[in-house]
Amino acid sequence: MGEQNKLYYDVEKLVNSLQESFDLDCAQSVSLFTSKSRSNEAWLEELENKFKLKDDVELDDVENLRAEIDMKLNMLEDKVSYYERLYKELEEFQNEIKIKTVVNNRRQSRTPK
């Protein structure tokens, strides 16, 4: 029975040693986590002071302005397309007039006077 008691005592001593080691590791981890959390909170506060966030009303105003600018840009693109097509049509018309003028001049030069 002495051997069994010694074995029981050694096992309990080992369990206590492991528990102490585990508790120490946990305490160090919690301490490190707390330290990093505080550091991150300080950094976040520094960033919040450095970069002010816009409130919802201001963000909505910016979004509305962006939508308005997009709409105006689309209208402008439509107008540019219209004027490009008009330019091509006028160019074609001008070429037709040139051809008709040449043909008419030839016709007039052939007719006896």
Curated annotation (Swiss-Prot):
Give the species this sequence originates from: Saccharomyces cerevisiae (strain ATCC 204508 / S288c) (Baker's yeast)
- Which Gene Ontology BP terms does the record give? endosome organization; regulation of protein localization
Q: Which family does it belong to?
A: Belongs to the BLI1 family.
List the keywords (alphabetical). Answer: Coiled coil, Endosome, Transport
Q: What else is known?
A: Present with 1240 molecules/cell in log phase SD medium.
Explain the purpose of this protein: Component of the biogenesis of lysosome-related organelles complex-1 (BLOC-1) involved in endosomal cargo sorting.
The chain's disulfide connectivity reads none
What protein am I looking at? Biogenesis of lysosome-related organelles complex 1 subunit BLI1
Q: What is the lineage of its organism?
A: Eukaryota, Fungi, Dikarya, Ascomycota, Saccharomycotina
Xref: InterPro entries: BLI1
Keyword Transcription among record annotations: no
* Gene Ontology cellular component list: BLOC-1 complex; endosome
Where are the annotated coiled coils located? 57-97
